[in-house]
Structure formats: C-alpha cells, structure tokens
Amino acid sequence: NTRKVVAWAKKKGVSVEAEIGAIAGIEDFVSVEEKDAHLTNPERALAFVKATKCDALAIAVGTLHGAFKFKGETVLDYDRIAAIKKLVRMPLVLHGASGISPELVERAKSQCSILGDCARLENAHGVSDEAIRKAVARGINKINIDSDLRIAFTAGVRETLMNDKKAFDPRKILGPARALMTEVVKHKMELFGSAGKA
C-alpha cells in the first residue's frame, strides 16, 4: 500500500514517487495489455495524493513502456497533464517516454545475424521530441527514458565487438557504450529543459 511506503520512507528521509493509472507495455517483467491500460483521472489523482502524501506522481497520459510505443504519431493527452498539474501541484512523472532514436536502433541492429536476432527492434518507435516539449510545457517534471539508454548501450557494445573481434577488456568494450549513452543523456537534458540545473 502506497500510504505505508510513504510513511516508512518519510521516517528515513526518502521521497516516494507513486503511480496512478496503468501504462501499457512491459516494465520489470510486468506486462500490461493496451486493453487494460487506463489514463489517470485528474480528480482521482488529487484524492490519491491527499491519501498517500507521496512526493511525486507518475501519471498515465498515453505513453507505453518499452521500445514499441506507437504505430504512427505520438498521441499524448496534454490537456489531462495540465488538469492534473493544476490540481495536485507536485512533480509529475512521465513513464514510458523514450524517443527510440531511429539512428541508434539501426546501429543496435547492425550485425544482428552474428550477435543475435534484432527483428523485434524493427517496429521500435517512441515518443517524439515535440511531444516531450509539449508535455513539459503542460507540467511534466520527470521523464523516464530507460529504453533509449538500453538501445544506446546495446549499439555501443555491438559495434565495439564487431570492430574488434579480439576485444576482451571490459573497459574498452563498455567505454563506447557509455559514450553513446552520455550523448543520449545530453540530448535529453536539453530537451527536458534540465541542462545546467543541478
């Protein structure tokens, strides 16, 4: 129960991010089908925040967990974000917001015949930069982009192993992956408006 977690965490000086609504996709081996997903109701969000006293609230406004989000354009409910922000007046979190860079997907898919099956990346498509900008403008404060970092890491490791078949030093294998992830993080910090704010 979220209320119990918040009470315990506050005693330890730890903040709690809670989630209301259900986001489709797979996260931490838990799968939610699109038919079972539901968007966050603003009034229920307010009641939830009052009841739990959480520090940040992750809301469901149309994103999906994982690398396979949309068949076409990103469709987020910006009015819902603004309505929730107006009521709860706390940091709002957007889960499942990876952009899934086509360039990095292609790099991760390179040499799939040797390093593994990448057919599942064929349909990878994420949340557009423009959609993120609009979500931030409406009140989103924290944005989760795990799939972007996984794809960058995978691309960096695969490229290194393909270019140097004798590589066995983890520092030389992981270094390029870390560098690609760093580039993604730099771009996202600019996009989110968080660059230079420590």
Which residues are covered by each model-predicted region?
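C-terminal alpha-helical cap/extension of soluble enzyme domains
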Residues: 112-118, 127-198
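Alpha/beta enzyme core
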Residues: 1-94, 99-133, 137, 159, ...
